[in-house]
């Protein structure tokens, strides 16, 4: 497979959907971004694409309840899933959302990878582990980005990355763990390389 290098700066907004059933047809390749409401998901997407307002960062965690789709190239889509685990969202809504999220991760044919974003200071909460579990059971590769890495010293950062790498071994999946900071541009290149790899089957001769 030839190595490809997509230009993520050309990424543009495609559409929003109120729920999993409303997202566009199951074609091309999709890569989903998931994370707790305050994990810095929108910030990471904006850093990857070098666009300040591509993904709206909300001052109110849990506000982004829509699924937002972005197109990098024709048939190459990034899917921004609503933040999970925010207390102010009604319990019934949470349960419904988690159910459809599990279905999406396990049944969506064009889904090629999952990026899970977690605050480096509070990684692997219950719902993060649930996401990883669903992905692994669907044979979906996972990139765990430990966000806000600039909040820790370099040695503390390395320690956290090592701890998370050891903690995920029992999942026995294809899981890569990297530190990430939009502010200090840590891990953006590694994210782009991983996305290129996941999108590459579309460009195979």
Swiss-Prot record:
The keyword Cell division applies. Its cofactor is Mg(2+). Pfam families: MMR_HSR1. GTP binds at residues 35-42, 62-66, 80-83, 147-150, 180-182. Keywords: Cell cycle, Cell division, GTP-binding, Magnesium, Metal-binding, Nucleotide-binding, Septation. InterPro entries: G_ENGB_dom, GTP-bd, GTP-bd_ribosome_bio_YsxC, P-loop_NTPase. Mg(2+) binds at residues 42, 64. It comes from the Bacteria. GO terms for biological process: division septum assembly. Belongs to the TRAFAC class TrmE-Era-EngA-EngB-Septin-like GTPase superfamily. EngB GTPase family. HAMAP family: GTPase_EngB (MF_00321). NCBIfam families: GTPase_YsxC. Necessary for normal cell division and for the maintenance of normal septation. This is Probable GTP-binding protein EngB. The gene is engB.
């Amino acid at each position: 497979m030839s190595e490809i290098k997509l230009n993520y700066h050309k990424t543009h907004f495609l559409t929003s959907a109120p729920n999993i059933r409303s997202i566009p047809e199951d074609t091309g390749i999709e890569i989903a971004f998931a994370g707790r409401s305050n994990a810095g998901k929108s910030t990471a997407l904006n850093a990857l694409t070098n666009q300040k307002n591509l993904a709206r960062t909300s001052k109110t965690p849990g506000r982004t309840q829509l699924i937002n789709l972005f197109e990098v190239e024709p048939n190459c889509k990034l899917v921004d899933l609503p933040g999970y685990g925010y207390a102010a969202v009604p319990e019934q809504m949470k349960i419904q959302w988690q159910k459809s999220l599990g279905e999406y991760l396990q049944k969506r044919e064009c889904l090629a990878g999952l990026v899970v974003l977690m605050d480096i200071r509070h990684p692997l909460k219950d719902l993060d582990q649930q996401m990883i579990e669903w992905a692994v059971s669907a044979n979906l590769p996972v990139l765990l980005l430990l966000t806000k890495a600039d909040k820790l010293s370099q040695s503390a950062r390395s320690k956290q990355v090592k701890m998370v790498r050891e903690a995920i071994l029992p999942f026995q999946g294809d899981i890569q763990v990297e530190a990430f900071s939009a502010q200090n541009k840590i891990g953006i290149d590694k994210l782009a390389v991983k996305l290129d790899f996941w999108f590459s089957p579309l460009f195979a001769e």
